[in-house]
Regions:
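N-terminal secretory signal peptides and thylakoid transit peptides that target proteins
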Residues: 1-20
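Cell-envelope/ECM-targeting effectors and their regulatory/trafficking segments
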Residues: 12, 28-30, 45-48, 151
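Short arginine-rich
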Residues: 20-21, 77
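Second-shell loop/turn segments in exported
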Residues: 31-36, 51-58, 114-119, 126-130
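Short, well-ordered surface patches within globular domains
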Residues: 33-95
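A well-ordered secondary-structure block
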Residues: 88-175
C-alpha cells in the first residue's frame, strides 16, 4: 500500500466528503432559475398572456423538458411510438400534473405525425404576448389560463431560418 503525503490525504479526504454530501442530498434539486435573454422575453410574453393570474416561475427541470420537446421538432421524424417521448417523460417525472398539460409551441401534423414549431421568438415581449392573445384554436395555449399553473420551462431554438420557442408547464415542483 502506498503511503500518502499530507496534501494527497487532504485532497482525497475533501473529495470523499464532497461525494458523501452529494449522495446524502440525493442530487441537485430542480430550482427556479433567473431567466436571461430570449427566455426572459418568452416568460414575459407568457405572463402577459396570463393577465391577472399569478406569474409563472421559470424552472430548470422543466427547461430540460422543453429542450426535449425542441429535440422532437428538430428530429423532423414521425413520432409513432412511446419511445419518441421517453426523454420528455423522464424530464417531467415528479412534477405536479405536468403530464396533464400539452407542450406549448408544439404543433403536430396529424397526417405525417411529425412535430413542428408554432411560435416565433421575437425581441419584443409585449408583441409576442399580443400575438399569443390573438391565437385561436390552440388548446395548449388555452391551458395557460389555468390559475393552478405555477412553473414553466422554456427552450428557444433555431429551426429553418427562424427562432422559435416551446414551453412546458406544471402546477408544482418535483415531489420527493
Amino acid at each position: 500500500m502506498k503511503e500518502m503525503n499530507r496534501r494527497e490525504f487532504l485532497t482525497l479526504s475533501g473529495a470523499s466528503v464532497a461525494m458523501l454530501a452529494l449522495a446524502a442530498c440525493g442530487g441537485a434539486p430542480s430550482t427556479p432559475v433567473a431567466p436571461t435573454g430570449k427566455e426572459a422575453k418568452v416568460l414575459e410574453a407568457l405572463n402577459l398572456y396570463r393577465g391577472e393570474l399569478s406569474p409563472l416561475t421559470l424552472d430548470s427541470g422543466l427547461n430540460k423538458a422543453a429542450e426535449e420537446v425542441a429535440k422532437m421538432i428538430l428530429l423532423n421524424k414521425p413520432l409513432d411510438d412511446m419511445n419518441s417521448y421517453a426523454e420528455f417523460d423522464k424530464a417531467i417525472a415528479g412534477y405536479k400534473k405536468a403530464e396533464a398539460y400539452q407542450p406549448i409551441g408544439l404543433s403536430m401534423n396529424v397526417e405525417t405525425n411529425k412535430a413542428a414549431p408554432r411560435y416565433v421568438c421575437q425581441d419584443d415581449a409585449k408583441l409576442m404576448g399580443e400575438q399569443l392573445m390573438a391565437q385561436t384554436g390552440d388548446p395548449a395555449l388555452k391551458q395557460l389560463k389555468s390559475p393552478k399553473l405555477k412553473l414553466v420551462g422554456i427552450h428557444v431554438f433555431e429551426y429553418g431560418s427562424a427562432t422559435y420557442w416551446v414551453a412546458v408547464v406544471a402546477e408544482g415542483g418535483k415531489t420527493a
